[in-house]
Regions:
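Active-site-adjacent loops and short helices of periplasmic peptidoglycan-processing enzymes
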Residues: 1-119
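Domain-terminus/edge residues, biased toward the C-terminal soluble/receptor-binding domains
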Residues: 99-319
């Protein structure tokens, strides 16, 4: 997963690379690359994600990082950025050739969440079958995704990555979406991982609802006269919660104290605060609060629109 997202973010995804001797000689699962063949980096990522091609992983590492060691440096740097505090990468494919190559289920979930925000990664991860022309032969390469949850077992699965080594045993990271709720499941050393993931997803989809905690647009109930009718957030805040958890949610608004020069010059920072969402005292989301100075003409227009909307919905207004 890390190797794939770094390849995609490198800006070289459509670059053609030449497969080296060291890439062809990697042990384990393979997409059977040929030394000296020229292949697009994007095709290598498909071979990596769908067929666990260790040869593809090395070819990607050499193309993006200049060498395997150079690429491993990029992997650990990205892991630090994502917050994977219990992860150390030592190679681009995950084989048991380094003692300190290790991670956790939680860190893998953080990585998958990060990667799934990339459209190209999401598309590749969710591909069931990929076909590409073989550069050296008359026949095409056809790769079927090893993720059986995606291909046959679970209709709500949207992607993932399988894995196996002698030390880690069966490992599996998958994603699923149902009724607007996106979930990630991770298992390590789990012999019955397909059923484990389905069970976790079904349990979560049954118990959790996507709950709206704050609506995109203008913030109401702002008491400060300087900020009143001037503040907004740019996105809806929605979070999966059980009915019991919904009662433990708190929304807190923190604003910068208005400065004298703001009132004198009218020059106010774009971001003037934040909206924090807490569940049982733990921060689950934080959204910037933006300031937008409206002219009296704009305010009059928007007030009329608001009153009209209230009248159409049958609600009463103070005016």
């Amino acid at each position: 997963i890390m190797t794939a997202i770094l390849a995609i973010e490198s800006g070289k995804i459509n670059k053609t690379v030449t497969v080296s001797h060291s890439a062809v000689g990697v042990e384990g699962s393979s997409v059977y690359l040929v030394e000296g063949e020229k292949i697009k980096l994007k095709d290598l990522v498909y071979g990596l994600m769908l067929r666990s091609g260790n040869d593809a992983a090395v070819a990607i590492a050499e193309a993006v990082g200049g060498s395997e060691d150079g690429f491993v440096y990029l992997m650990n740097k990205k892991a630090e950025e994502i917050g994977m505090t219990n992860t150390t990468f030592q190679n681009p494919h995950g084989l048991d050739d380094h003692e300190n190559h290790r991670s956790t289920a939680h860190d893998m979930a953080l990585l998958m969440r990060y990667a799934m925000n990339n459209k190209i990664f999401k598309e590749i991860s969710g591909t069931k079958v990929y076909r590409m022309k073989h550069p050296e032969e008359k026949w095409d390469r056809v790769w079927k995704n090893k993720n059986k949850l995606l291909t046959t077992l679970y209709a709500y699965c949207t992607g993932g990555k399988t894995g196996y080594t002698k030390l880690a045993k069966r490992t599996l990271v998958t994603t699923a979406t149902k009724d607007g709720m996106d979930l990630i499941a991770v298992t390590i050393n789990a012999p019955d991982d397909w059923n484990d993931h389905i069970s976790m997803y079904e349990n979560a989809f049954d118990k959790y609802d996507m709950t709206s905690l704050a609506a995109k647009g203008e913030l109401a109930d702002i008491k400060d006269s300087f900020y009143k009718d001037q503040l907004y957030i740019k996105r809806n805040v929605v979070y999966p919660l059980t009915k019991k958890e919904q009662s433990s949610v708190e929304v807190k608004t923190t604003l910068i104290q208005p400065k004298k020069q703001w009132k004198e010059t009218g020059e106010v920072p774009n971001v003037v605060g934040k909206l924090d969402i807490y569940r049982s005292g733990e921060t689950i989301d934080s959204v910037p609060i933006y300031f937008e100075k409206q002219s009296e003409q704009q305010k009059g227009f928007f007030d009329k629109v608001k009153r009209l909307m209230f009248i159409q919905s049958g609600a009463k207004t103070d005016g």
